[in-house]
């Protein structure tokens, strides 16, 4: 199991805001996508980002991950403003986009080992198996990903979260293509992450159970819980 990093919580009690967005704005083609985004997340906290298609949910996550630059505003981590390519910040986050980001010619085992190497870690056969088991997909670890269903591929992508500890999860529609049993596996993984002092910012079209703050983009409208 991944080992939580230190300095974010004490005996499971949050020590104050760790991630903060300050008046964030993002534009595409000269047109504003969102403006005036302010929020903070402490250890054990989760923000659910909701809104209609085109409201900027995915763009916000990509700004937070450093893949896009904001038009204005700032992101701070542990009280320090995050600069482009900040290694300390990037090594503290895990990003799972709406697309799975998987080379389908690899097996699930090969994909997770490669993902671990990118973080400077060596994944053993057992750590990969355990990570896949957390998402209920360990039996397919040596099967080419191209032969898996969309739901199975999504679970392989999410298994990266169980393989390598990262304090901040940035997740774009994590439940896409998941059945109820697989969604329950993800909820258990998320709950454990938050109990261990982790944080998450999750873009979703359907509110996840378990609470947390809700950040509405693109105007108010009601969303049913998952």
Curated annotation (Swiss-Prot):
Catalytic activity: heme b(in) + ATP + H2O = heme b(out) + ADP + phosphate + H(+)
Stretches assigned to the ABC transporter domain: 19-226
One term of GO molecular function: ATP hydrolysis activity
Organism: Cupriavidus pinatubonensis (strain JMP 134 / LMG 1197) (Cupriavidus necator (strain JMP 134))
Name the UniProt record assigns to this protein: Cytochrome c biogenesis ATP-binding export protein CcmA
Lineage: Bacteria, Pseudomonadati, Pseudomonadota, Betaproteobacteria, Burkholderiales
Family under the similarity heading: Belongs to the ABC transporter superfamily. CcmA exporter (TC 3.A.1.107) family.
Disulfide bonds: none
Main location: membrane
Gene behind the chain: ccmA
């Amino acid at each position: 199991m991944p080992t939580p990093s230190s300095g974010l919580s004490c005996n499971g009690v949050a020590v104050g805001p760790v991630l903060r967005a300050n008046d964030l704005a993002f534009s595409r083609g000269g047109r504003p996508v969102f403006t005036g985004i302010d929020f903070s997340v402490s250890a054990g906290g989760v923000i659910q980002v909701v809104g209609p298609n085109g409201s900027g949910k995915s763009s916000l996550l990509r700004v937070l991950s450093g893949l896009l630059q904001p038009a204005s505003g700032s992101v701070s981590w542990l009280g320090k403003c995050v600069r482009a390519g900040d290694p300390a910040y990037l090594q503290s986050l895990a990003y799972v986009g709406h697309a799975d980001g998987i080379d389908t010619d690899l097996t699930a085992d090969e994909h997770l080992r490669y993902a671990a190497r990118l973080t400077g870690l060596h994944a053993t056969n057992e750590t990969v198996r355990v990570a896949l088991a957390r998402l209920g997909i360990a039996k397919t670890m040596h099967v080419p990903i191209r032969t898996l269903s969309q739901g199975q591929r999504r679970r392989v992508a999410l298994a990266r979260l169980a393989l390598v500890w990262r304090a901040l999860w940035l997740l774009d529609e994590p439940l896409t293509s998941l059945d109820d049993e697989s969604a329950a596996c993800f909820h258990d993984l998320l709950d454990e992450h938050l109990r261990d002092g982790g944080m998450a910012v999750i873009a979703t079209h359907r509110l996840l159970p378990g609470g947390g703050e809700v950040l509405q983009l693109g105007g108010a409208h009601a969303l049913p819980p998952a």
